[in-house]
């Protein structure tokens, strides 16, 4: 239950919440998972709920916005939307498995994806298995 772990929980319709304002300080925002609909609303400035409003604020304040887009495959419209968001300063980071880490479970895959997203904020997640190079590879 994630709600029990949160310091504050807002309702999606609560567009008057503090995080809907640029004066509310954050390190940025991670949207995980991010649907194509949410991604599209953020890209076009549609702020129909607190999630898209908060993301819009993060972009306008030039803070990191990481969108872990979940749908695949992508069509050209999705790719153009991702390009537009990247040009606005967002980071598109689909939650893809890092097979070099040899995940043994879904939890391992989730931990690796979360860790990679937190890395973008300079935050350490001990569950991340980091690449340490090829063993026995000749030095250049």
Residue spans of the language-model regions?
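A cross-family phosphate/adenosyl-ligand binding-site feature
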Residues: 1-66, 72-140
